[in-house]
């Protein structure tokens, strides 16, 4: 798909143009200075056209200086239907772009097996996407980009930094989403598109086949609508790409400064890509793009409050002069050509994780640390916690540390006063605080009619039921509270205290006995006693 109407690839055309440039300079030098002038002109021409300076020839740097920092703006996506199912598509510059949100497997545990290694079965092998670039009737995609974005912890308040220190050095994502962005070129598929209703409908059908293929592998996937495409671009920094605050080394948007780096060809591997989630940044955007010729590229965009002075890793190369184009390559639009990026052959395996790592619970019997997600991007989640306050409050504040906005609905606000923080609200009404993503309620047994006061019931009830209901709700009960089998099936995650610091965790059909990790830095959030500051003398 890189060939042009001339029949030559862009690289061949540039090589021919470079030879002609050197020839013209040599001829001019010969006319002005004879043999010495010709030799000097050839040396200067080769240095300007062919010699690599910091990864690119001098003429390429000149082009970036003149044209690299331009705002990138696209048409609005539209909604089209195919096979009685609708989806969003953007047609821009001869390319139709569609997207699929990869939801993966719900509530799958992540185990920390070492100081820099984690294990999870909620993953996707990018190499397996290569066959999905070709479709019936010789329809071929330009590329598929696997865009993963999120952050290790929250960015508001003091506790997220404490939680980050508790996690330590392993790769961890408190928030993480994965999207597949597919680009269908029109000119390169002229023959195949003759048999299609429209370019947009053909792109929608491609996205539907990709989503169906992923579902057959047990990975939930959802076709994006036009609203989803626009919202995804906004979250990935479309304001920075379309704005004028563009520097040579970074671009600025409403959420902060964005700097994009390229992975060298020899560094693209599963282990290296996972290390992106060790970075302390407001947000990390990782982009792995697969091409039909079995090659790939990888970039990482880091969002920080101020421009990053140096790359976060020695293996990363900053894409100077083309930061806006590099950030636009993460979005739902035509993929721009990045001069500072080189393709490499696909490795035998290139695994990347899907969804958040989860909330830190504690240690297993073999010494591994267990993390369980309490939220899910695709479905509503219910979590049951039967434990005393020293454990229940730790779980709640760790959800905040992971980046969620929590609202506690309680009639006993003094009980929860110690956990109050910027991203955790305590209310006594059913209406949650604005932008709440996780609700916390207290468990109360339903009493039978004519009961003599004993708390025996037939079902789960809560003291205050949040309305409207957040996507995830955590129900807090006293230790020893038991659930009937029917009620237990209503919860995706259960955490039950069986000893002073031991809990039984159940999620996704699996069960673990975990020793809860009690960090001293969290004591001020779980204690009922007021915390005072002492001034050293």
From Swiss-Prot:
Keyword set includes Nucleus: no
Organism domain of life: Bacteria
Signal sequence, start to end: none
Main localization of the protein described in the UniProt heading: membrane
Keywords of the record: Cell membrane, Membrane, Transmembrane, Transmembrane helix
Subunit architecture: Could be part of the ESX-2 / type VII secretion system (T7SS), which is composed of cytosolic and membrane components.
Protein family per UniProt: Belongs to the EccE family.
Protein's recorded name: ESX-2 secretion system protein EccE2
Biological source species: Mycobacterium tuberculosis (strain CDC 1551 / Oshkosh)
Gene: eccE2
């Amino acid at each position: 798909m890189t060939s042009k109407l001339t029949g030559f690839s862009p690289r061949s055309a540039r090589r021919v143009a470079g030879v002609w440039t050197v020839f013209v300079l040599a001829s001019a030098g010969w006319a002005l200075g004879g043999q010495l002038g010709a030799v000097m002109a050839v040396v200067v021409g080769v240095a300007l056209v062919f010699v690599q300076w910091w990864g690119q020839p001098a003429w390429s740097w000149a082009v970036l200086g003149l044209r690299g920092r331009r705002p990138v703006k696209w048409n609005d996506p539209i909604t089209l239907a195919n096979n009685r199912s609708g989806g969003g598509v953007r047609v821009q510059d001869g390319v139709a772009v569609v997207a699929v949100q990869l939801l993966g497997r719900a509530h799958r545990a992540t185990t920390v097996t070492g100081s820099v290694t984690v294990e999870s079965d909620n993953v996707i092998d990018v190499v397996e996407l290569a066959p999905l670039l070709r479709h019936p009737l010789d329809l071929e995609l330009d590329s598929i980009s696997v865009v993963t974005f999120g952050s290790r912890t929250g960015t508001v308040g003091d506790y997220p930094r404490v939680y980050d220190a508790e996690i330590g050095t392993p790769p961890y994502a408190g928030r993480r989403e994965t999207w597949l962005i597919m680009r269908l070129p029109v000119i390169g598929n002229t023959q195949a598109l003759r048999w299609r209703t429209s370019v947009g409908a053909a792109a929608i059908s491609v996205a539907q086949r990709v989503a169906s293929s992923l579902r057959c592998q047990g990975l939930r996937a959802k076709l994006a609508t036009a609203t989803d495409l626009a919202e995804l671009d906004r979250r990935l920094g479309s304001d920075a790409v379309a704005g004028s605050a563009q520097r040579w080394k970074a671009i600025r948007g409403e959420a902060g400064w964005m700097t994009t780096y390229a992975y060298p060809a020899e560094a693209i591997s599963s282990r290296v890509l996972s290390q992106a989630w060790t970075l302390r940044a407001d947000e990390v955007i990782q982009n792995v793009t697969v091409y039909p010729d079995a090659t790939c590229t990888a970039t990482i965009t880091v969002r920080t409050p101020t421009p990053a002075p140096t790359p976060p890793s020695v293996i990363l190369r900053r894409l100077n002069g083309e930061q806006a184009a590099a950030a636009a390559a993460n979005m739902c639009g035509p993929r721009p050509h990045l001069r500072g990026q080189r393709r490499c052959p696909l490795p035998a395996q290139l695994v990347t994780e899907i969804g958040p790592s989860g909330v830190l619970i504690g240690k297993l019997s073999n010494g591994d640390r267990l993390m369980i997600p309490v939220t899910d991007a695709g479905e509503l989640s219910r979590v049951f916690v039967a434990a005393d306050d020293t454990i229940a409050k730790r779980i709640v504040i760790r959800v905040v540390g992971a980046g969620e906005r929590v609202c506690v609905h309680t009639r006993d606000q003094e009980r929860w006063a110690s956990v109050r923080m910027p991203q955790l609200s305590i209310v006594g009404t059913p209406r949650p605080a604005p932008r709440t993503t996780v609700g916390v309620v207290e468990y109360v047994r339903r009493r039978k009619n004519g009961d003599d006061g004993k708390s025996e019931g037939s079902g789960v009830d809560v003291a205050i039921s949040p309305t409207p209901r957040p996507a995830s709700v955590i129900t807090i009960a006293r230790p020893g509270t038991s659930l009937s089998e029917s009620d237990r099936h209503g919860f995706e995650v259960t955490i039950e205290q069986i000893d002073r610091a031991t809990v039984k965790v159940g999620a996704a059909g699996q069960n673990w006995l975990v020793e809860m990790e009690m960090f001293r830095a969290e004591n001020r959030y779980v204690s009922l006693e007021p915390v005072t500051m002492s001034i050293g003398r």
